[in-house]
Amino acid sequence: MTNLIDLTFHELESLIVSLGEPPYRARQVWQWLWQKRCREIAGMTDVSKALRARLEEVAEIRWPVVEMVRESRDGTVKFLLALDDGERVECVLIPEKDHYTACLSTQVGCAMGCGFCATGMLGFRRNMTPGEMLGQVLVGRQYLTDKGVELGLRNLVFMGMGEPLLNYENLLKTLEALHHPQGLDFSGRRITVSTAGVARHLLDLGRTGLCSLAISLHAPTQAQRERIMPGAARLELDKLMDLLAQYPLKPRERLTFEYLLLAGVNDADADARELVRLLSRVKAKVNLIVFNATPGLPYSPPDEARVLAFQDILKSKGLTATLRKSKGSDIAAACGQLRAECDGEGEGEGK
């Protein structure tokens, strides 16, 4: 049976028309789904009983099921969500100064095989549907409402389980639904999609104007990247940078490059200088992330002095480089950790 939250607005409109109703009825149903977070068609009280009855014959509303919630001392909240087929994914609410950011998954598992990430250890299971991706936003907002939290869910980052651009069609439908003014009404400035670099849809995404882009880079050379991110090696760094140089940006906009610091792997002064050289070809800023030491993975975090020295080299060359503080380490908040823990398959670091 059709899950209404899987539908774009135009698909919902077509469904409503096929049931013999005028198209404007779709706006009413859409608002119930996204603004009022209605979970039963019968609860749409300003929709006619006849339409509700016909809708219930062909459709339903299915959110992901919250299987586990973990709350960190720093305010981070991690959800383990069960999908219709029993697969499980994760999403995270991250507290900021005046709002929350949700970190969303796009696939069950991942084919990229990054050596520092627990999701890669799971392998690729399947793509998530638009409703499954959007359902994470509904779950997050409902949690904050139920807790009476005053800070709202304002920003979305597609940096959870999976490679978003390998689920491009469903990602695009999700972004369109997020933008709809009579629904969740997120602006493109509030949405970031992170990719390891998939050539096929990279520029297509930029042309939509529906989000900002972040690149999961993590290494300044092709050889280093192949060692820690074997799946990303399909697109050579030089070719990736050539594509990114064509990526459509607003006048003051820059591409964000995520760089996970691994002791003795990619944190040397020479790595920092090579990173500056690599990024000189594009309008860039760097988000440095310190690896969280994790049993079962062959990596460790650099010490604070090494991290600051790396950052100082980038900044001295005129490159904006921020240091992202890890949150939720006490609740396995990095990508794939909670599912892997529950599956008994180990833990890892997110992108």
From Swiss-Prot:
> From the UniProt record, which GO molecular function terms apply?
4 iron, 4 sulfur cluster binding; metal ion binding; rRNA (adenine(2503)-C2-)-methyltransferase activity; rRNA binding; tRNA (adenine(37)-C2)-methyltransferase activity; tRNA binding
Q: Which cofactor does it need?
A: [4Fe-4S] cluster
- Give the main location: cytoplasm
Q: Which terms does the UniProt entry file under GO BP? A: rRNA base methylation; tRNA methylation
Spell out the InterPro entries in the cross-references: Aldolase_TIM, Methyltransferase_A, RlmN_N, RNA_MTrfase_RlmN, rRNA_lsu_MTrfase_RlmN/Cfr, rSAM
Q: Where's the Radical SAM core domain? A: 96-330
Which domain of life, per UniProt? Bacteria
Name the catalysed reactions.
Answer: adenosine(2503) in 23S rRNA + 2 reduced [2Fe-2S]-[ferredoxin] + 2 S-adenosyl-L-methionine = 2-methyladenosine(2503) in 23S rRNA + 5'-deoxyadenosine + L-methionine + 2 oxidized [2Fe-2S]-[ferredoxin] + S-adenosyl-L-homocysteine; adenosine(37) in tRNA + 2 reduced [2Fe-2S]-[ferredoxin] + 2 S-adenosyl-L-methionine = 2-methyladenosine(37) in tRNA + 5'-deoxyadenosine + L-methionine + 2 oxidized [2Fe-2S]-[ferredoxin] + S-adenosyl-L-homocysteine
The UniProt record lists the keyword 4Fe-4S: yes
| Location within or outside the cell | Cytoplasm
E.C. code: 2.1.1.192
An annotated GO cellular component of this protein is: cytoplasm
* Keyword DNA repair found: no
A Pfam family cross-referenced in the UniProt record is Radical_SAM
Q: Which residues form the active site?
A: E90, C335
Q: For [4Fe-4S] cluster, which residues are the binding ones?
A: C110, C114, C117
Cofactor: bound how, per the entry note?
A: Binds 1 [4Fe-4S] cluster. The cluster is coordinated with 3 cysteines and an exchangeable S-adenosyl-L-methionine.
| Disulfide bond positions | C103-C335
Leading EC class: transferase
Q: Which UniProt keywords apply?
A: 4Fe-4S, Cytoplasm, Disulfide bond, Iron, Iron-sulfur, Metal-binding, Methyltransferase, rRNA processing, S-adenosyl-L-methionine, Transferase, tRNA processing
* Remaining remarks: Reaction proceeds by a ping-pong mechanism involving intermediate methylation of a conserved cysteine residue.
The record describes the protein's role as:
Specifically methylates position 2 of adenine 2503 in 23S rRNA and position 2 of adenine 37 in tRNAs. m2A2503 modification seems to play a crucial role in the proofreading step occurring at the peptidyl transferase center and thus would serve to optimize ribosomal fidelity.
Family (UniProt): Belongs to the radical SAM superfamily. RlmN family.
* Protein name, UniProt field: Dual-specificity RNA methyltransferase RlmN
